[in-house]
Amino acid sequence: KVYHEIGRVKKDFRNFNKPIVIVSGCVAQAETEEMQKREPYIDMVIGPQSYHRIPDLILNYQRKKLFFNETEFDVVNKFDYLQKIPNSQNAISSYLTIQEGCDKFCHFCVVPYTRGPEYSRPLNQIIDEAENMVNNGVREITLLGQNVNAYNFFDNKINYKLSSLIRKLNNIKKLKRIRYTTSHPKDMTDDLIDCYKDCEKLVPFLHLPIQSGSDPILKLMNRKHDKKYYLSIIEKLKKINNGIKFSSDFIIGYPRSEERRVGKECR
């Protein structure tokens, strides 16, 4: 899809002066060398940890006119920079990244190789940013992370998990709603489930990808759980909050999946 889109862009600009072409994101980072070989049309490849540097990188390219690759991991530097940017004055709902990277290594996913290992932002930094958002008019905050419920920050020998963070955010007076995405079933702990009972600002909705309803396929995917485990989480949440709603992700036709198993994958 990436190469198809690059080809489409080339056609669009055939009769115009060529713009600076930047390919960014996880796939771009994983395919940097191949992209440079196949598409000399590309001027820069930028990894997900360097989005905040795009203006500076463009200026650098304009001076040197050389292919530029910015894909090094520097997640701490990125968050130090981003927290200095003021929140939009008009936003009612806003996103707040609390965690990056993943240690799960699902066989279909490139994230651990492009975003790096799991990193959790300092708790006080997140609370400060959330309070700043609320003071600027935000009333709903969605907590973000590649594996958001793996949030795990240590401070003075105290272990703060996603449940700890949600409980602290729940005490911010003018904040009305809290959401989070995207989660992994293995990190859906009982203390996090209890938040759906104890924290009135936590929206009773959960996006929890399972990827397949077939245990053999889940094993091939290296998901580290089976269907029974996933359904037990759903049942716990329903007992805590009968009104909770769910969404999920499914991969149909996973490599080495047999046609007769597709029905199980869907069920």
Regions found by a protein language model. Give the residues of each.
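Conserved SAM/AdoMet-binding glycine-rich loop
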Residues: 21, 25, 30, 135-255
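Charged helix-capping and loop-helix junction motifs
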Residues: 3-6, 123-124, 157-164, 226, ...
